[in-house]
């Protein structure tokens, strides 16, 4: 069963749902609107390896916006930090965002009970689109749970995304594999490279990172 606006508000007041910052105007009929944070990232290598950490190149979006282009995966992040206790959160794109040809997640729309963090977005576009930090990007929907829970996400030792960060977090799929013999594994928490503000964030297909380039407002 999906929570109504009244039930979401009650859960926020009781602390079972935490949304920071919380804006009453963002509470919809049966959802809560979340916004795009200021950071975007792309993977450095053109071909990713599921068995190893994949470095990312991060940019901070300038005031004039940032152009997303087709054929490129972008990792974004929500402006809001959330916690969900006793419910299951789902993140879906807003209709107005979808009509711009923007997908905000590949397959990872469902959160777990006990998830306490910002939401990393796996963004792609059908056509070039200029986006802006702070724009509405998605909506959280909350489902009731049937039956008791043994371990919430925040208490699972195997949970890979418990470290709280307002930055996009790259895939940690490699933690599901044993490190290859003789391979000096990179730290899963330090796969980020910083770029100068105002970048374009594209990555060369052959694995060479292009220097981000801003596109000015037109």
Segments and roles (model prediction):
Residues 1-202, 206, 218:
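DUTPase catalytic domain/fold
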């Amino acid at each position: 069963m999906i929570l109504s606006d009244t039930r979401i508000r009650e859960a926020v007041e009781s602390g079972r749902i935490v949304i920071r910052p919380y804006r009453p105007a963002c509470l919809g009929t049966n959802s809560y609107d979340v916004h795009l944070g200021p950071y975007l990232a792309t993977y450095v290598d053109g071909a990713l390896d599921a068995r190893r950490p994949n470095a990312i190149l991060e940019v901070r979006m300038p005031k004039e916006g940032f152009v997303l282009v087709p054929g490129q995966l972008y990792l974004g992040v929500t402006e809001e930090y959330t916690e969900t206790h006793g419910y299951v959160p789902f993140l879906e794109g807003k209709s107005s965002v979808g009509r711009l040809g923007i997908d905000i997640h590949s397959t990872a729309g469902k959160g777990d009970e006990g998830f306490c963090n910002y939401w990393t977005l796996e963004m792609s576009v059908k056509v070039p689109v200029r986006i802006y930090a702070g724009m509405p990007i998605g909506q959280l929907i909350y489902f009731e749970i049937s039956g008791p829970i043994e371990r919430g996400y925040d208490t699972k030792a195997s949970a890979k995304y418990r470290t709280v960060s307002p930055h996009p977090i790259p895939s940690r799929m490699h933690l599901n594999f044993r490190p290859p013999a003789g391979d000096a594994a990179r730290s899963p928490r330090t796969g980020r490279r910083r770029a100068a503000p105002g970048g374009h964030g594209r990555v060369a297909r052959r694995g060479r990172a292009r220097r981000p380039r801003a596109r000015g407002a037109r």
